[in-house]
């Protein structure tokens, strides 16, 4: 499909022809976005549409006709595609088509240079031979009924998940018992899991051995460099939010409040978050909130959902959260993707200046996300006067991130 797009483009007839993809592999909005971004004029996901039709007939929980169900599926794909486009500031399909606004992870340079010529890649991976062998295996498999693949929800014997039921059970056991052996068993499960993320592929040479014991002063100095990613009260429960703050304060590190404010009763105690975040919605940002900080953090983007704003569903906005965010209970709270008072480096410099005027001794960090070219953005942020630049990776997420972003958006570093 990609080669056909390149062929007609190189011949100068791309604008005179349409590419319609008929595929049984397209399932969700990410699949659709990939096809459009690599040149498809239209996509017909025939297998997904047929599956939706069958579900509407067999399901006892819906009164939708097959046509209505298929139309709902089409609308969901369109809405998801618009969401993906909006992350990059694009509002029309014609501007997104052929843009190749993706990053390749897991394919070698030979494939990228031949097929995804204008797409960024920073890793090596599998090649044509591996893909060809896989296709041969799939072609030889006879028709069998396949179960749910386990891509989103963990299934035994299916795709590996970082937070598997086994891992969660061991964590719960360690927390409830307070036994260090149980905690050690939980950590061992994490460290010896199957390779799921790129960092799981990194290993230290066997010749390197660390037998040196650190004294308490050296450990304290190391712990001061540790921070916990900012996650808001609402995305996390009050108990989890306070536990993270207290744990980091006890070892001398820092935790982030996230967007949404913090209970004033925690200020000046061991439950206070040292890093206070200022995000696009400005929820919970008050003079007292800022005065309790040891570091200000301006959130320009979030690692697990770059280009998206925050959204806290109304059912999560109880009386306590509504009070902290100075809003109404039960109302969905939406933070826009951009800061509406920041449209240039000069605007960012003004906010940094205002924060430093409020507390000259408090460093200001700016949170960006990992992406190709982030270095250029970081230079501008440094020129704006930021003391610290935080680069959030793709797994810097919370319960407030949608599935499509968790699975497909952001880079590991």
Features from the language model and the residues they span:
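Active-site beta-loop-alpha junctions enriched in small/polar residues
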Residues: 22-26, 48, 260-262, 301-303, ...
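Gly-rich Lys/Arg/Thr-decorated short loops/hinges at beta-loop-alpha junctions or inter-strand turns
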Residues: 1, 14, 223-228, 306, ...
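Active-site-facing alpha/beta catalytic cores
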Residues: 236-354, 358-365, 370-381
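Flexible glycine/proline-rich, aromatic-decorated loop/lid segments
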Residues: 2, 30, 34-64, 71-72, ...
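Conserved, mostly hydrophobic/aromatic
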Residues: 35, 92, 248, 348, ...
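Short, small-residue-biased leader/transition segments that mark boundaries at the very start
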Residues: 3-8
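Catalytic cores of alpha/beta
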Residues: 26-38, 372-384
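Flexible, glycine-rich loop/tail regions that form catalytic "lids" or insertion modules at the edges
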Residues: 32, 44-47, 57-284, 293-306
């Amino acid at each position: 499909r990609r080669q056909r797009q390149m062929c007609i483009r190189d011949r100068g007839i791309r604008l005179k022809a349409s590419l319609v993809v008929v595929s049984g592999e397209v399932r969700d909005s990410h699949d659709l976005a990939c096809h459009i971004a690599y040149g498809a004029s239209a996509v017909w996901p025939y297998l997904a549409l047929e599956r939706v039709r069958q579900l509407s007939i067999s399901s006892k929980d819906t009164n939708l006709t097959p046509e209505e169900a298929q139309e709902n599926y089409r609308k969901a794909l369109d809405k998801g595609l618009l969401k993906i486009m909006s992350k990059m500031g694009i509002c029309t399909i014609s501007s997104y088509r052929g843009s190749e606004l993706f990053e390749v992870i897991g394919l070698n340079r030979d494939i990228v240079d031949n097929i995804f010529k204008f797409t960024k890649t920073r890793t090596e991976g599998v090649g044509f031979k591996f893909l060809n062998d896989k296709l041969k295996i799939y072609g030889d498999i006879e028709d069998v009924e396949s179960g749910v693949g386990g891509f989103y929800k963990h299934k035994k014997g299916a795709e590996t998940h970082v937070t598997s039921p086994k891992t969660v059970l061991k964590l719960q056991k360690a927390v409830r018992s307070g036994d260090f052996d149980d905690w050690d068993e939980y950590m061992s499960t994490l460290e010896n899991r199957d390779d799921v993320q790129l960092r799981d592929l990194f290993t230290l040479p066997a010749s390197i051995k660390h037998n040196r014991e650190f004294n308490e002063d050296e450990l304290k100095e190391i712990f001061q460099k540790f921070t916990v990613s900012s996650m808001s009260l609402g995305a996390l429960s009050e108990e989890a939010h306070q536990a993270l703050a207290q744990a980091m304060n006890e070892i001398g590190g820092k935790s982030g409040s996230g967007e949404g404010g913090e209970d004033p009763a925690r200020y000046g105690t061991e439950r206070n978050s040292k890093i206070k975040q200022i995000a696009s919605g400005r929820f919970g940002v008050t003079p007292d909130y800022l005065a309790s900080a040891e570091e200000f953090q301006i959130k320009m983007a979030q690692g697990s959902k770059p280009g998206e704003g925050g959204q806290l569903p109304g059912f999560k906005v109880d009386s306590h959260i509504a009070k902290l965010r100075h809003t109404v209970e039960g109302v969905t709270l939406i933070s826009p993707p951009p800061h509406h008072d920041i449209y240039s480096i000069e605007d960012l410099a003004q906010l940094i200046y205002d924060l430093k005027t409020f507390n000259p001794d408090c460093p200001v960090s700016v949170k960006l996300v990992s992406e190709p070219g982030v270095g250029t953005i970081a230079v501008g942020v440094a020129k704006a006067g930021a003391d610290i630049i935080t680069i959030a990776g793709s797994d810097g997420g919370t319960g407030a991130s949608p599935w499509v972003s968790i699975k497909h958006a952001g880079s590991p570093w």
